[in-house]
Amino acid sequence: MGSPFFILSNKGESQIIVTKSSPILVPKVLFDARHIEDYLRLQYDVSKAGHILQDEIEDYISVSYLDKTENDCLTQLEPRYYQHITTFLYNILHRVIANKAANCLCLSIQDECIHFFLEKDNRLLLVNDIAITSDYDILYHALNILNQYGVDPDDCVVYLHNGNDTLAELLSEYTDVTLLKLT
């Protein structure tokens, strides 16, 4: 497995994009910062957590973390701003792309993992990640997610980050595909 993060630098600030396991989404109306570690414990062992990340994504607070070793190697970067890859791409779609599709599946491939979120009628329905083995594996999961949430592939755009041409071509046989490049 590769690095659990990558770094974007801009005007003296380092933006650290975390690409490890999916964040926990807590509805804003229920979120209490005093219980942030409890939220993470629902799904993860946080005994080695070094830095806890908290972001807003639609009506939710996204909570994830870097372990102590990962965090220690980043302490040399000042100032720094942490964000999970899912939140980062969500913000790009909502702030940068003028005519974002109402029904969309955003896929970000990081090593053997794909991070994704699904929106239907401009409402966030799902944030998760899946271990992957091939482009066909990604195609299967993408179509399965759309089917499970009642999203017609003909009425959906897949926003693809870090995908290859073969994957884009496979997906485009079923739905519209837009490549997201961060450079």
Language-model-detected regions and their locations in the chain:
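Hydrophobic/aromatic-enriched cytosolic interaction surfaces used to assemble or bind macromolecules
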Residues: M1-T183
